[in-house]
A protein has these predicted regions:
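A conserved catalytic-loop motif detector
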Residues: 55-61
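Ligand-recognition elements built from short beta-strands and adjacent flexible loops
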Residues: 85, 99, 127-228
């Protein structure tokens, strides 16, 4: 999405998107979930969800929104937020900034909002960066990869399991490719080179035989990385 300016807070953005993907219910946002006694673990206070308005959109419409936003991550501008094995939806944003009533050239707020699992959302992450330096200013290239990193950590913390049925990522020519490192320990230098040269990665070493390797076999690396 490309727009002129940003007129909502991050919390307002998350609240609105949450209503669009949860079946159409607008909830009052809150920061604190519960207060727990440090030593005993006893719950002193717990905040319950408060409905502001129900049926803002129908469940069918909400499902279509989720499906569409999932395709943004697998097929569209949000591919940098894709995580293998997880159904993720999201939307990129690029908003031109205003100064003294005039839209500024080359000065943007770039953002990405992502959620997972796309078919039954449990987590929403929104990130906006004001005028990033030294990089192409698009939400899909700047903000989406950071949201991906946050969601990867959240997946572990929340115990969200992988699931089947999502849309596989469609790679474009400008996407970086990932490879699984082959096991070349025990091979000669010539044998190892013949295997590694089939991938767009760097490799280096000394001697005539491979006695160790880094990263270890089975690791995932991005094109251009070095195997030693």
């Amino acid at each position: 999405a490309f727009g002129q300016g940003v007129s909502v807070t991050a919390l307002q953005q998350v609240t609105a998107v949450s209503a669009a993907i949860n079946g159409g219910t607008l909830y009052k946002p809150y920061i604190m979930k519960r207060v727990v006694e440090h030593e005993t673990g006893q719950i002193i206070k717990e905040v319950k969800p408060t409905v502001i308005r129900d049926n803002i959109i129908t469940e069918d419409t909400s499902e279509q929104v989720r499906m569409t936003l999932e395709s943004v991550v697998s097929l569209g501008t949000g591919r940098n937020a894709y995580i293998d094995g997880y159904r993720i939806g999201g939307k990129t944003g690029t908003a031109q900034k205003v100064n003294n009533g005039v839209y500024m050239q080359g000065n943007y707020i770039v953002s990405f909002i992502g959620f997972l699992p796309a078919n039954d959302p449990k987590l929403v992450v929104y990130l906006a960066i004001d005028n990033p330096k030294g990089i192409t200013q698009y939400g899909g290239t700047v903000s989406a990869p950071i949201v991906k990193n946050i969601m990867e950590d959240a997946i572990v913390a929340l115990g969200i399991e992988k699931q089947d049925g999502g849309t596989e990522k469609e790679y474009q020519w400008y996407d970086k490719k990932y490879y699984t490192v082959e096991n070349v320990i025990g091979l000669t230098k010539k044998e190892a080179t013949s295997i590694l040269k089939n991938f767009s990665i760097e490799y280096s070493g000394s001697g005539n035989n491979v006695i160790s390797q880094s990263p270890e076999a089975g690791s995932r690396i991005v094109e251009g990385e070095n195997v030693r």
